[in-house]
Each structure stands twice: as structure tokens, then as C-alpha cells.
Swiss-Prot record:
A Pfam family matched in the record: QueC
Sites where the protein binds Zn(2+): C186, C196, C199, C202
EC number: 6.3.4.20
GO biological process: queuosine biosynthetic process
Organism name: Xanthomonas campestris pv. campestris (strain ATCC 33913 / DSM 3586 / NCPPB 528 / LMG 568 / P 25)
Name of the protein: 7-cyano-7-deazaguanine synthase
Family from the record: Belongs to the QueC family.
GO molecular function, one term: ATP binding
Cofactor note text: Binds 1 zinc ion per subunit.
Length: 224
């Protein structure tokens, strides 16, 4: 069976990506990164999703981006309750580049020629590393910078959610049997994984379920 490495954050998008990769016949190796994020709830969620969706392997890699800082997700910066103009403070400098690089390295080790990530250019909150140009550029880099790219069958970077709305992602996940109740999207989730209901991630998630006409399984710490 062909293999793929899928970035798994523990959120709803990456859970849907795993299901989409499996639908395409890939044996999924899921990679999560402990990068110093504000809470560990999403990594707990990643473990639940990996187990529920039957991945071949789930690896958690430690790369502490708190030593760099520069983001509300890794430093002592307040997370805003509403989106604004420009790139938001929840942008983590070069995060997707770093994570895809880790996935690329593991893909070479396990013999996978395909990488999957959950970046989205529709409801993407303004992050520069969620744009189609970034995904295309990283695929070029992957094939220039690796043994697998130079001597092997080549590497492909898939972003199957790239042009889907959150509602489309919800519908795709429901069709494929994804249990979104296992996932955590909130920037301010508590130790039990309960969402704040007010941050940008919560807003996009709630709107996705509402627009899809699907009951929201999110566990909230307070009424949203």
C-alpha cells in the first residue's frame, strides 16, 4: 500500500485530511508537533484522532518554538477574540514550513512519497503559509532538497482542503465518518480541551458547522 505522512494537529481540518488520504488508498503515518503551544489539549486530541482513524503510526516530535517567540500561540501575548486586518498575532513564524520539513524528513525514512497538510486558503485567517503559492513552493523545495526527490519517484505535497470552506470540510468529514467531537481547534482551550467559544478558531469552526447544517460537537468551557 502506498504511504503518506499527514500533519495532525488535533484540530478538525487535519482529522478530515487523514480521512481524505485514507479514502485515496494511503496508509497514513500521522505526525504531530509539540512546539510549545499554549495548551496540550490539541496534542491529546491528536492522539484520540490517530487512534480512532486507524493510522499506521503516530509520531510526536518536539520542536520548542517558544525559544523564538513572536506569536500569541507561543509567547505571552493575548489571543484576540475577533479577527482583524493583516496577519494575526496567532501566526507562528514559519510554522508550516518547519512542520512540513519535519514531515518531509519522516517521509524519507518510512518511504512515503506523499505529504498531506490541512492548510486552507478560504477560511485561513490571513496566514501566509496557508496560501496555494506556499504549498507549490514547498513541493519544489522537497524535490530539490531530498534524496527521495533527486533519486526516487519524487515527492508530492497535498492540501486537499485548500479551496474548501469550513462547511465543505465539515460535510467531507461527516461523509467519511470523522468524529469531530474528538478534535480541538480553540487557541485558548482549557486542560480538558473545552473551547473558549470566542477566538478566531472557535468562530470559524462554529460557523462551519452552522453553515453545513451539522450539529456542533464542540465542548465549550462557557456558553458561546
Amino acid at each position: 500500500m502506498k504511504k503518506a505522512v499527514v500533519l495532525l494537529s488535533g484540530g478538525m481540518d487535519s482529522a478530515a485530511v487523514i480521512a481524505l488520504a485514507q479514502e485515496q488508498g494511503f496508509a497514513v503515518h500521522a505526525l504531530s508537533v509539540r512546539y510549545g503551544q499554549r495548551h496540550t489539549s490539541e496534542l491529546d486530541a491528536a492522539a484520540r484522532v490517530a487512534a480512532a482513524q486507524g493510522v499506521v503510526a503516530h509520531k510526536v516530535v518536539d520542536v520548542d518554538l517558544r525559544s523564538i517567540g513572536g506569536s500569541a500561540l507561543t509567547a505571552d501575548i493575548d489571543v484576540p477574540e475577533a479577527g482583524g486586518a493583516g496577519i494575526p498575532v496567532t501566526y507562528v513564524p514559519a510554522r508550516n514550513t518547519i512542520m512540513l520539513s519535519l514531515a518531509l524528513g519522516w517521509a524519507e525514512v518510512v518511504g512515503a512519497n506523499d505529504l498531506f497538510c490541512g492548510v486552507n486558503a478560504v477560511d485561513y485567517s490571513g496566514y501566509p503559509d496557508c496560501r496555494p503559492e506556499f504549498v507549490r513552493a514547498f513541493e519544489v523545495l522537497a524535490n530539490l532538497a531530498t534524496k527521495a526527490g533527486v533519486e526516487g519517484a519524487g515527492l508530492r505535497v497535498h492540501a486537499p482542503l485548500q479551496f474548501l470552506s469550513k462547511a465543505d470540510i465539515v460535510r467531507a468529514g461527516v461523509r467519511l465518518g470523522v468524529d469531530f467531537g474528538l478534535t480541538v481547534s480553540c487557541y485558548n482551550a482549557d486542560a480538558d480541551g473545552r473551547a473558549c467559544g470566542h477566538c478566531d478558531a472557535c468562530r470559524l469552526r462554529a460557523a462551519g458547522f452552522a453553515d453545513a447544517g451539522v450539529p456542533d460537537p464542540t465542548h465549550y468551557a462557557i456558553s458561546s
